[in-house]
């Protein structure tokens, strides 16, 4: 049995300015996205697209800026609407109190979809072409976010067997019984494993929309599995059919992603072969 080390959430204190580990993980997520996206510029079909203009670093900068806005706004609104709609409808000004915590991946994803739709429209590019470009660069950012959750000692797992070698006591949970370190599970599943699978998948010739569909299915399945080990939100608990809110939100992702992949697979033309 392990004990969570209760790491100081403040990584660096500069006078009145406190730099939190969680903020650094967001910074790492955006930095990793930029690095991987510049690599994607070398892959087909993006390396050979000329109309309405060649893909460039400026495109990546704009995608990242709009994506950050989508993550923050969508993540916050998603949390308020998916998890505590009654409370925030009664206290709408507290939606702006982001420093109190409360972000939703599913809301952030919707925010990113909307922001990239705007980017695609303004650059006259197919939306799915943009999303296929973005999708393989996302999982490393998710991994960074889960490490932030672990450092903060939040979003811990359900109780585990006392014999589980990596069972961990999270003192912030108010219990000294071992739990699953579900943040680590999500780091490995939604972060590292999804990244490896999707990056390799995206480097081969794919029809437009298949990479996006694969991301939706992959994330949805891995998150659905991880939720069995994650402690449900205490104000929601377990919902219908014994599933958590996170699992229910994954269902349309999996179904929609599978439908998108199938629809894309019916298209006649595939992208040219990718290169390293």
UniProtKB/Swiss-Prot annotation:
Gene Ontology cellular-component terms listed: plasma membrane
Location relative to the cell: Cell inner membrane
Gene Ontology MF, one: phosphatidylglycerol-prolipoprotein diacylglyceryl transferase activity
Segments crossing the lipid bilayer: 17-37, 63-83, 95-115, 182-202, 209-229, 235-255
Membrane topology listed for this record: Multi-pass membrane protein
Record pathway: Protein modification; lipoprotein biosynthesis (diacylglyceryl transfer)
EC number: 2.5.1.145
Biological processes, Gene Ontology terms: lipoprotein biosynthetic process
EC class (word): transferase
Keyword terms: Cell inner membrane, Cell membrane, Membrane, Transferase, Transmembrane, Transmembrane helix
Keyword Membrane: yes
Residues bound to a 1,2-diacyl-sn-glycero-3-phospho-(1'-sn-glycerol): 146
InterPro entries: Lgt
Family: Belongs to the Lgt family.
Function as written in the Swiss-Prot or TrEMBL entry: Catalyzes the transfer of the diacylglyceryl group from phosphatidylglycerol to the sulfhydryl group of the N-terminal cysteine of a prolipoprotein, the first step in the formation of mature lipoproteins.
Protein name: Phosphatidylglycerol--prolipoprotein diacylglyceryl transferase
Organism: Polaromonas sp. (strain JS666 / ATCC BAA-500)
GN (gene name): lgt
């Amino acid at each position: 049995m392990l004990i969570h080390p209760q790491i100081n959430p403040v990584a660096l204190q500069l006078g009145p300015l406190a730099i939190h580990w969680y903020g650094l993980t967001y910074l790492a997520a955006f930095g990793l996205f930029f690095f991987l996206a510049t690599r994607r510029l070398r892959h087909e079909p993006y390396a050979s697209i000329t109309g309405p203009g060649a893909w460039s670093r400026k495109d990546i900068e704009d995608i990242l800026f709009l994506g950050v806005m989508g993550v923050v706004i969508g993540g916050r609104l998603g949390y308020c609407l998916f998890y505590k709609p009654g409370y925030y409808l009664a206290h709408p000004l507290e939606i702006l109190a982001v420093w109190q915590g409360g972000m939703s991946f599913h809301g952030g994803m919707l925010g990113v979809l909307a922001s990239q739709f705007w980017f695609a429209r303004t650059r006259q590019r197919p939306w799915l072409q943009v999303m296929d470009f973005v999708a393989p660069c996302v999982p490393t950012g998710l991994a960074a976010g889960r490490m932030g959750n672990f450092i903060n000692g939040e979003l811990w797992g359900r109780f585990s067997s006392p014999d589980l070698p990596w069972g961990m006591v999270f003192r912030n949970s108010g219990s000294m019984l071992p739990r699953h370190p579900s943040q680590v599970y999500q780091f490995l599943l939604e972060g590292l494993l999804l990244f490896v699978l999707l990056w390799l998948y995206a480097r081969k010739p794919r029809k437009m929309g298949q990479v996006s569909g694969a991301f939706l299915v992959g994330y949805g399945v891995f998150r659905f599995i991880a939720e069995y080990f994650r402690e449900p939100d205490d104000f929601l608990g377990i919902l219908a059919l014994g599933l958590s809110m996170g699992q229910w939100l994954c269902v349309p992702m999996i179904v929609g992603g599978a439908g998108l992949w199938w629809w894309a697979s019916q298209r006649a033309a595939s992208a040219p072969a990718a290169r390293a």
